[in-house]
């Protein structure tokens, strides 16, 4: 993980750690003119590592975004941000996106009253995301909410920390996307 962060820059969904501000000797030796291919490859890798996608999953999202109306890049980021694992991360119910994926895979999360165990589930506006009624599920979410720094919540999400409940208001606005993509 840390090699990826040093190479690509901060990836908030992968880990809360940040790259060192000092310039490493390796990076000084490798610095120079970056080709268009390298820039595109690094941006693609940022998306893959931040959202925890395989190459095939990312290609499917690019294909869907290409067919949709509007800017392909913006539509792609909206599709990725509306995934269930990412919404749990944005709500503060998990410290990282891989942690949110684990919560979903272990069946701790309900969407509109039904268990969803697919991290790539595409949330829609007016979806209600809650935890299972089991004590173990609530304790897990409670620990994440208590330990996470209360960052500003995106305006397309609402959270009720006492009931461990989140609501998707609308499709995300492009200014709230946390990852800077070139």
From Swiss-Prot:
A Pfam family annotated for this UniProt entry: S4
Record gene name: rps4
Organismal lineage: Eukaryota, Viridiplantae, Streptophyta, Embryophyta, Tracheophyta
Self-association and partners: Part of the 30S ribosomal subunit. Contacts protein S5. The interaction surface between S4 and S5 is involved in control of translational fidelity.
Family: Belongs to the universal ribosomal protein uS4 family.
Highest rank taxon of the organism: Eukaryota
Function: One of the primary rRNA binding proteins, it binds directly to 16S rRNA where it nucleates assembly of the body of the 30S subunit. With S5 and S12 plays an important role in translational accuracy.
Key words of the record: Chloroplast, Plastid, Ribonucleoprotein, Ribosomal protein, RNA-binding, rRNA-binding
Gene Ontology biological process terms, A to Z: ribosomal small subunit biogenesis; translation
Gene Ontology CC annotations of this record: chloroplast; small ribosomal subunit
PROSITE patterns: RIBOSOMAL_S4 (PS00632), S4 (PS50889)
GO molecular function terms noted in the UniProt entry: rRNA binding; structural constituent of ribosome
Protein name as catalogued: Small ribosomal subunit protein uS4c
Subcellular location: Plastid, Chloroplast
Organism of provenance: Alophia veracruzana
Gene3D superfamilies the record matches: Ribosomal Protein S4 Delta 41, Chain A, domain 1, RNA-binding S4 domain
Claim: Ribosomal protein is one of the keywords in the record: yes
Major site of localization recorded for this protein: plastid
Residue ranges of domain S4 RNA-binding in the record: 82-143
SMART domains: Ribosomal_S4, S4
């Amino acid at each position: 993980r840390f090699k990826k962060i040093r190479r690509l820059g901060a990836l908030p969904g992968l880990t809360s750690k940040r790259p060192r501000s000092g310039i490493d000797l390796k990076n000084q030796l490798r610095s120079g003119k970056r080709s268009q291919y390298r820039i595109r490859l690094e941006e693609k890798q940022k998306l893959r590592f931040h959202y925890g996608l395989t190459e095939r999953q990312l290609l499917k999202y690019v294909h869907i975004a290409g067919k949709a109306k509007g800017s392909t890049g913006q539509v792609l980021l909206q599709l990725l941000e509306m995934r269930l694992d990412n919404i749990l991360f944005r709500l503060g119910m998990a410290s990282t996106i891989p942690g949110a994926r684990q919560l979903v895979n272990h069946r701790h999360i309900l969407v509109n009253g039904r268990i969803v165990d697919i991290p790539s589930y595409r949330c829609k506006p007016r979806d209600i995301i809650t935890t299972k009624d089991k004590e173990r599920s609530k304790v897990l979410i409670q620990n994440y909410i208590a330990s996470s720094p209360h960052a500003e919540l995106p305006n397309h999400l609402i959270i009720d920390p006492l009931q461990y409940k989140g609501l998707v208001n609308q499709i995300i606005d492009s200014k709230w996307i946390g990852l800077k993509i070139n």
